[in-house]
Amino acid sequence: VLARTRKHEENEEENDMTDKERFKAIFETQVMRAGAEKLLEWLESTDFFEAPASTRFHGAYPGGLVAHSLNVYDQLLFDHSALKYGGQTLAVCALLHDVCKANYYHRDSDGWTVRDTLPMGHGEKSVYLIQKHMSLTDEEALAIRWHMGAYDEAYRGGSRALGEAQERCALVMALHQADMRATQQEKLREGL
């Protein structure tokens, strides 16, 4: 009972936080590797915490990207196949899978538009940007690279690497499914 009470109190405290505060609290307590502080500093220098998650499909509002990242984190924690990777890896993958969207969307008179200054693909761009500041394990890199699943341009172009990545690493499918569940929940909440 005491453990449940403490967990309830922690959840209440977490609910009082902004999404940015919650993201930073999770990141700072879970990610303990060289470069993590520099990565967080870089994120703060971008629009990551104010950016939308998309132009119109889900989270198309200021702060939608960080809200989506937290939703993916929450979903990934429910996936028993992912738990074996540990808290640090789950936080890295879920919280950072869409860092490619930092400084990516811009507001205009019609809403949000895309201005991609580094057009290298979605998942691979996130891996690249993270590794400019902090190293990733092979499993983390695979999961982030392929988190779009069959929606990834390389897969749609005929690449077989997605299937190989999923066979080698359960985290690839776990992150993809967490991302899809979070997106669907967001779309329902937003009436899309």
Q: What kind of region is each of these model predictions?
A:
Residues 2, 6-192:
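Metal-dependent phosphohydrolase cores
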